[in-house]
Every structure is written in C-alpha cells, then in structure tokens.
C-alpha cells in the first residue's frame, strides 16, 4: 500500500494545532495565523482577520515535534544542502554527496528530497519507478543500494509528469510527514535536499529538525556573481534562522575534458568566485567541483558518478568535500572515507 497525496496515511496519531478560519486572504506582511503574534502584531492593524486570529485557540508547541525528535533519534548526523539560486547543481550535488558517503560500506545514508514542486532525486538515483510502502512502522524509504535510501514526493505521484501545484501549508505538511512518518531506522547521515531560495520549506525543515539537532548546512554556488548574489542572501538566512553553516561548495568551477583532462573556464569568477566570498563572509570553503559532462549522464541513467568514474577530478573533488564536511561535524575523515575508498 502506498500513501496517497489526497489522504496521507500517518504512522502516528497526534493532535494537531487549531488554525483559525479566516474571512480574507492573509496580507503580505502577515505574521501567520498560527504564530504567537497572530492578531497582535503591527501588521495586523486593519486586517479583516485580526479579531479571528486574536481570539483563536492559544498557540502552543507543535505536538508533532517530540514525535519527529524520537523518530530521528537513531540518525547520527543531519545535513542540509541549500542554494540561493536554482540551476547551480544543488540536487545533483546532494546525490553525489549521498553516493560519496555511501561509498564506504560501513556507512548508512538517507537522502530526503524536500523540493516538493520539483523533485529530481529519484531520477538521479535510478529509482524513479519505485513507490513508497506503508507498514505499522511507518513509510519505508526506497533503497537505492543496501546502505543508501531515498524519500521524495515523486514516489507518490500517480503520473510521474504530474505537476505539484501546492501552496506553502500543504507543502509544509508533507515535509512534516517525511520527517515524522518515514522509518529510516539507524542512519549515519541524513542529507536533506532543499529547493532553491529561502522559502516555506526551509523554515519548516529548520523548525521541525531543530529539537532533534541539525549538524548544519552545505551551501552550493557556481563561480559567477549572479549566483553569489543569492548565496549572500542564503548565508544571511542561515544566520537569522540559527542554522550552522558547514561551508560553501563552488560547483561547476571549470570544465574538465574527459579525453585530455584539460580544464576550461565556463562560468568565469568575475568577482573572485566562491572562495573569496567564503573568506569575506567568514564561513568555511569546502572546495570546488569541476564540471564533468559525465556527471549529467550518470544522473540521467541513475548511476553513481563517484563509483563509475573514480578517477575523474570531479569525483576526487566530491570525496574531498565529504572529508571536509566530516571534519566539520566531528567525524574522522579517514574513517568516513578510508584511504582505500579515496583511492578507488
């Protein structure tokens, strides 16, 4: 039995918060009808919903957070992957990161796709045709390999080409179910792939995971200034939301020819690129990953680029990023990716 998008099947029953019935759309600067400031904030003055929000049931802690915390208690490390702009290869990088961590057979890795409207992880992992199964223990992730599992809304769509046209609250509800109802079991690493920008999904993930502990976020950019412009906003978002920044990764830094291994600059770092930005913003720089056309091919075929092309400069760069991230979260890089795995 697979969960339905119309009537999701929760693995646990828990009381939900009471949301007021509004008589008008929420204005632009609304603090949120379920927030502590609902009906009381300066932005509420003159709003048709002010009396309704102010008199609704007092807001308390989300009752699902303790359930989520308990559910995720067997996961040692939780890592967010963020980007300020779309198209920088964030989801591709998330899949590469997951494969690289899982290249150590002693590690068990989960990859959660929270890009509700643009899920691409199942395609990249080669499990696009799979569906989610539900048991008394919860939703079962789709296992790509023996030690690498994935979860995405794509597994729940009746037609893989169906558009998901949802507003924030419904997307947030599904993300909550991913965290509350998915039976990951014992994991060494849970990598959470997020949509670009600083949207509702990011706020939900941060709020719901805060109690269970998030190790931090890896921010992905490309060298050109148009990407760095939004990365600065992403860094500011992390600092305001209290999310630790593990570091910045510069993706697509140069094109590596598979034939001769020469490197050509495709996206020129007109303002110094990711390394200079990281230094200026006071965050760690985790490394640059060159552009290899075989990365796209591996993702299209749902294969592990790291395993298929271990000698590629891009593979070596990804493994070095994994070692850097491991060090940032308090793990021994030589145990996460032993020398024999690095040499493969």
Swiss-Prot record:
Q: Keywords in alphabetical order, please.
A: 4Fe-4S, ATP-binding, Cytoplasm, Iron, Iron-sulfur, Metal-binding, Nucleotide-binding
Listed InterPro entries: Mrp-like_CS (IPR000808), Mrp/NBP35_ATP-bd (IPR019591), NUBP1/Nbp35 (IPR028601), P-loop_NTPase (IPR027417), YlxH/NBP35 (IPR033756)
Lineage top rank: taxon:
Eukaryota
Q: Where does [4Fe-4S] cluster 1 bind?
A: 30, 44, 47, 53
Q: Which residues bind ATP?
A: 84-91
The subcellular localization recorded is: Cytoplasm
How is the co-factor bound, per the entry?
Answer: Binds 4 [4Fe-4S] clusters per heterotetramer. Contains two stable clusters in the N-termini of nbp35 and two labile, bridging clusters between subunits of the nbp35-cfd1 heterotetramer.
State a GO cellular component annotated for this protein: cytosol
Per the entry, which co-factors are needed?
[4Fe-4S] cluster
Where is region (Disordered) located? 1-41
User: Which SUPFAM superfamilies does UniProt cross-reference here?
Assistant: P-loop containing nucleoside triphosphate hydrolases
Q: Extract the signal peptide range.
A: none
Q: Which GO terms describe its biological process?
A: iron-sulfur cluster assembly
* GO molecular function per UniProt: 4 iron, 4 sulfur cluster binding; ATP binding; ATP-dependent FeS chaperone activity; metal ion binding
The answer on whether this UniProt entry bears the keyword Ribonucleoprotein reads: no
* Transmembrane feature ranges: none
Instruction: Give the matching PANTHER family.
Output: CYTOSOLIC FE-S CLUSTER ASSEMBLY FACTOR NUBP1, NUCLEOTIDE-BINDING PROTEIN NBP35 YEAST -RELATED
Q: What family does the entry list?
A: Belongs to the Mrp/NBP35 ATP-binding proteins family. NUBP1/NBP35 subfamily.
Q: What does this protein do?
A: Component of the cytosolic iron-sulfur (Fe/S) protein assembly (CIA) machinery. Required for maturation of extramitochondrial Fe-S proteins. The nbp35-cfd1 heterotetramer forms a Fe-S scaffold complex, mediating the de novo assembly of an Fe-S cluster and its transfer to target apoproteins.
Q: How does it assemble?
A: Heterotetramer of 2 nbp35 and 2 cfd1 chains.
From the Swiss-Prot or TrEMBL record, give the protein name.
Answer: Cytosolic Fe-S cluster assembly factor nbp35
